[in-house]
Amino acid sequence: MKRSEKAAVIEAIKAKADKASFAVLTDFKGMTVEELTNLRGSLRKAGGEYLVVKNTLARIALTDGTHDVIKDKFRENIGVAFGFDDPVAVAKALSDFAKQSKLFELRCASLDGKALEVAQIDALAKLPGREQLLGHLLGTMNAVPTNFVSLFANVLRGLLYALKGIEEQKSNAA
């Protein structure tokens, strides 16, 4: 690989790393191209991307960036998964894939500049996703006006029954 090609690869990795809030190092030794393609597809759906790069180029690209804390972990066959939107979705996709494939291993991760171990990645994968949390938040926010309307309707219903009772008393008295 020529020096200019190396510089282009470093810049591409650096650009992706700067955009990503989450980076996971994985061991992919012995995996087939088809398995890696399936992994890339599931990560794409989760808002992530998977790269297989030379370790020295990745170390250079991650130096002085958000994911600087994991740059020294590049050894042997390491792939990098970047998460751009929802780290939980990417962690779930990687964790699920690791359970399916005996050859695929999670090594470590960086979340907003903080190093994570495998157990922490698995814990992150068990959290509810962004969509679930937003749905729960909207449900909670919707509960207050719904309860208010229900309470107001009950008060009005009670008032109507009271007025109806008074009307019946007056019609019986007359």
Curated annotation (Swiss-Prot):
Signal peptide: none annotated. One of its GO terms (biological process) is translation. InterPro entries: Ribosomal_uL10, Ribosomal_uL10-like_sf, Ribosomal_uL10_bac, Ribosomal_uL10_bac_type, Ribosomal_uL10_CS_bac. Keywords: Ribonucleoprotein, Ribosomal protein, RNA-binding, rRNA-binding. The keyword Metal-binding does not apply. GO terms for molecular function: large ribosomal subunit rRNA binding; structural constituent of ribosome. CDD domains: Ribosomal_L10. The keyword RNA-binding applies. NCBIfam families: PRK00099.1-1. HAMAP family: Ribosomal_uL10. Belongs to the universal ribosomal protein uL10 family. Part of the ribosomal stalk of the 50S ribosomal subunit. The N-terminus interacts with L11 and the large rRNA to form the base of the stalk. The C-terminus forms an elongated spine to which L12 dimers bind in a sequential fashion forming a multimeric L10(L12)X complex. Forms part of the ribosomal stalk, playing a central role in the interaction of the ribosome with GTP-bound translation factors. This is Large ribosomal subunit protein uL10. It comes from Desulfovibrio desulfuricans (strain ATCC 27774 / DSM 6949 / MB).
